[in-house]
Amino acid sequence: MRFFAVSIVLGLAGKTFAQAADVSYTSDEAFKEAALNVTNTYRDWYNATELTWNDTLAEAGEQAVESCIFEHSGQEYGENLAAGYPNVTAAITAWKDEVDEYDYGNPDFSMETGHFTQLVWGNTTQIGCARKECGGQGEAPGWFIACEYSPHENVLGQFADNVEEQVRGPGSGAGRPEVWAVGLVGAWMGLVILGELA
């Protein structure tokens, strides 16, 4: 099997990465779009259906972040929390990265993988998220994010049916070009695409 690599260099038009990332927190529309798009991208990787945005769930998320206390709100929905990430994409990616600890041979709930399993739970159909700049007050450093999911997931005895192994995306072994690495040097971003030659 032979592999090829293609490097693409993209300019960021003089904007720094941090400046561009802040929009996902400061703009309501950008926040909603990023939360929904990143969530649905990862769900696609794990063969779960796309979620739709639900304003009632977003309002529940607002209640969860309002106090800047980093603890689950105890509402009737599934809930993922994150704080201190530079943008919403990084927060949701951290939830997805818990897959490294998930044991598909023993599919069950664990504190180490609960965010991941909520993110990709097969029976979930809707999401709503909220964020608040806590500025170090309370127990949430920086931006505090809550995403609420419905129907509620992480149901004991249902993990094998609702948390599938990765079928698409980087590392899936699907045999198609995938984004392998993204590097940032100054105002330039290098994108390496690794694929398989037949």
Locations of regions flagged by a protein language model:
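Sec-dependent signal peptide recognition
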Residues: 2-9
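N-terminal signal peptide
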Residues: 10-26, 191-198
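Short, well-ordered surface patches within globular domains
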Residues: 21-78
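Solvent-exposed loop/turn segments at secondary-structure junctions
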Residues: 43, 58, 67-68, 86-88, ...
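All-alpha RGS (Regulator of G-protein Signaling) helical domain and cognate RGS-like helical scaffolds
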Residues: 67, 72-74, 84, 116-121, ...
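Acidic, polar low-complexity intrinsically disordered regions
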Residues: 70-74, 86-99
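Acyl-group handling in specialized metabolite and lipid biosynthesis
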Residues: 81
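Disulfide-stabilized extracellular recognition modules
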Residues: 93-198
